[in-house]
Amino acid sequence: MIRRLQDNGDLIRAFPRVHFVGIGGAGMTGIAEVMLTLGYEVSGSDNADNVATRRLATLGARVMRGHSAANVLGTDCVVVSSAIREDNPELMEARSQRIPIMPRAAMLAELMRFRHGIAVAGTHGKTTTTSLIAAVLSEGGLDPTFVIGGQLLAAGANAKLGAGQWLVVEADESDGSFLRLNPLVAVVTNIDADHLENYGNDFSRIKDAFTEFLQRLPFYGLALLCLDDPEVAELAGKARRHVMTYGIDAAADVRAEDVVQDGARMYFTLCLPEGKVIPVTLALPGRHNVLNALAASAVGWQLGVPPEVIGRALKSFVGIGRRFNDLGDVAIGNGACVRLIDDYGHHPRELEAVFAAARGGWPDKRLVVAFQPHRYSRTRDQFDAFAAVLSSVDALVLSEVYPAGEVPIPGADAKALARAIRARGRSEPVVVGQVASLIEVLPDVLQEGDLLLMMGAGDIGSIAQRIVHDGFVFGEV
């Protein structure tokens, strides 16, 4: 049936039904929630059930477990995650029925079409920076729409449809899909060698993609670039758009001075253009989070948020799910306890930043790390860097690599990584086959007063939650 667009331009009534294949993915749930709030009939499928899919169901989405051709019948558009294979039965059925298929980033670009877009790109720190920008703009009364890759703890969600004109999103460089976006403001936090498999194992192609990302800005657009990152600093010199820099670097336009850490809090002086200076308290540990806060401050200043309001937003920001989440003290037996921190970090540079934050906040505690490597290709490409940073902790437990759909690569598994760490002569890592075994193994490694970091982008976060709710397992299982 051929449908006519309504004279009043109400496209929602003309094409109301949107189906998401892989709806439980971090990049998909936020778009689905915004479209639900806009009035679309949203359905979706995923092989796994999680907090995000259950939330969407309570909001009115129809969520199916597993993939079936029948799931797309009657839908007007199919949105697909980059993790979905071309032979997925729902995609095949959509093609046979001539239903439009849109990649996730293309649908995000459609949402941006009707608002002023702020896109946050970078290998690390995107989620935290995007969340901080949303918090600053919200505190400033701009009521932005935001779509974030992690759960904003204050909102209990990773997306919100605001009444204001600004849309704040993460721009995913991992597969080059950020080049579909046409923002008004582009933030680049850092550029690192990750997801090389999508760039022909050529780091220069990643850097070229970021250059092209900035070229997608209109001539009146703005690039906000972190001067502390050498690759981004180089990009700043080549950008053919209006540029504003931020960083702890003394030459940055928006910068932090007198940076001090006390436990999980950072204190610094925020120096804005035109001589504006305010003291800031940030409830996120680590210098990397100071940089994230500076990016949000720069955006807020550009959009007219008063400096004192920026400071208030940063102080009240409570964080994002799985970004240095302090889960409190957990018992390890005999009346002893350890402090448990859950974190999404899965790249050597992220591990290094989190370790520095942990040592800066708790210098007297022994640092024990349970790490689940993510992807065999990343473990292979960053093998030496992983071995170097992981050998710096006081005690280490490695689980097997979370494959994320990849097949094993010889020499890029947990045992090989443990051998490389052991060869450095600084630590004796323990290797477990399944991540769930951490519940049984960790009590034998931990000591009273330790700081335990559980890190990785796979399913190790669910194990941290099990430990909080059910405790460790002692003795025979």
UniProtKB/Swiss-Prot annotation:
One of the Pfam families matching this protein, by short name: Mur_ligase_C
Entry keyword set: ATP-binding, Cell cycle, Cell division, Cell shape, Cell wall biogenesis/degradation, Cytoplasm, Ligase, Nucleotide-binding, Peptidoglycan synthesis
EC category name: ligase
EC numbers for this chain: 6.3.2.8
InterPro entries per record: Mur-like_cat_sf, Mur_ligase_C, Mur_ligase_C_dom_sf, Mur_ligase_cen, Mur_ligase_N, MurCDEF_pg_biosynth, UDP-N-AcMur_Ala_ligase_MurC
Organism: Xylella fastidiosa (strain M12)
Annotated protein name in UniProt: UDP-N-acetylmuramate--L-alanine ligase
Protein localization: Cytoplasm
Domain of life, per lineage: Bacteria
Catalytic function, reaction form: UDP-N-acetyl-alpha-D-muramate + L-alanine + ATP = UDP-N-acetyl-alpha-D-muramoyl-L-alanine + ADP + phosphate + H(+)
HAMAP family: MurC
Pathway stated in the Swiss-Prot or TrEMBL entry: Cell wall biogenesis; peptidoglycan biosynthesis
UniProt record similarity statement: Belongs to the MurCDEF family.
GO biological process terms held by the UniProt record: cell division; cell wall organization; peptidoglycan biosynthetic process; regulation of cell shape
An annotated Gene Ontology molecular function: ATP binding
Chain residues that bind ATP: G122, T123, H124, G125, K126, T127, T128
